[in-house]
């Protein structure tokens, strides 16, 4: 998967096209990611002891990983991802600026 938890990404297709956010969770087996503030759905919850009121809340739903692209840390634009071996470790590199995406 070309993106990881904590990456700044932009949605490149779908109803939330153009929105930016941080990846909250990644689901590699399903090829989906959870992006902050994107693909909001209404969740209905029954009253419980923890939440006696119950009601409707908004929360993020996962979107397919092909619909997001990481933002270049140098320019802030979307970029493709390349891979390079540095100090014996495989790191992700922004194709536009050549800057390393992994911390």
From Swiss-Prot:
Gene Ontology biological process terms from the UniProt entry: translation
UniProt GO MF annotations: DNA binding; rRNA binding; structural constituent of ribosome
Pfam name, any one: ribosomal_L24
Keywords from the UniProt entry: Cytoplasm, DNA-binding, Ribonucleoprotein, Ribosomal protein, RNA-binding, rRNA-binding
Annotated CDD domains: KOW_RPL26 (cd06089)
SMART domains on file: KOW
Gene Ontology CC terms: cytosolic large ribosomal subunit; nucleoid
Protein localization: Cytoplasm; Cytoplasm, Nucleoid
Subunit structure: Part of the 50S ribosomal subunit.
Similarity remark: Belongs to the universal ribosomal protein uL24 family.
Function comment: One of two assembly initiator proteins, it binds directly to the 5'-end of the 23S rRNA, where it nucleates assembly of the 50S subunit. One of the proteins that surrounds the polypeptide exit tunnel on the outside of the subunit.
Name of the protein in question: Large ribosomal subunit protein uL24
Species in which this protein is naturally found: Bacillus subtilis (strain 168)
């Amino acid at each position: 998967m070309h993106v990881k938890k904590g990456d700044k990404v932009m949605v490149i297709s779908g109803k939330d096209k153009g929105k930016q956010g941080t990846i909250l969770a990644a689901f590699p087996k399903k090829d989906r990611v959870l992006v902050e503030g994107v693909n909001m759905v209404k969740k209905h919850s029954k009253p419980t002891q923890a939440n006696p009121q119950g009601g409707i809340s908004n929360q993020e739903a996962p979107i397919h990983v092909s619909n997001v692209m990481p933002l270049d840390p140098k320019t802030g634009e979307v970029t493709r991802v390349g891979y390079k071996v540095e100090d014996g470790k495989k790191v992700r590199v922004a194709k536009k600026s050549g800057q390393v995406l992994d911390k």
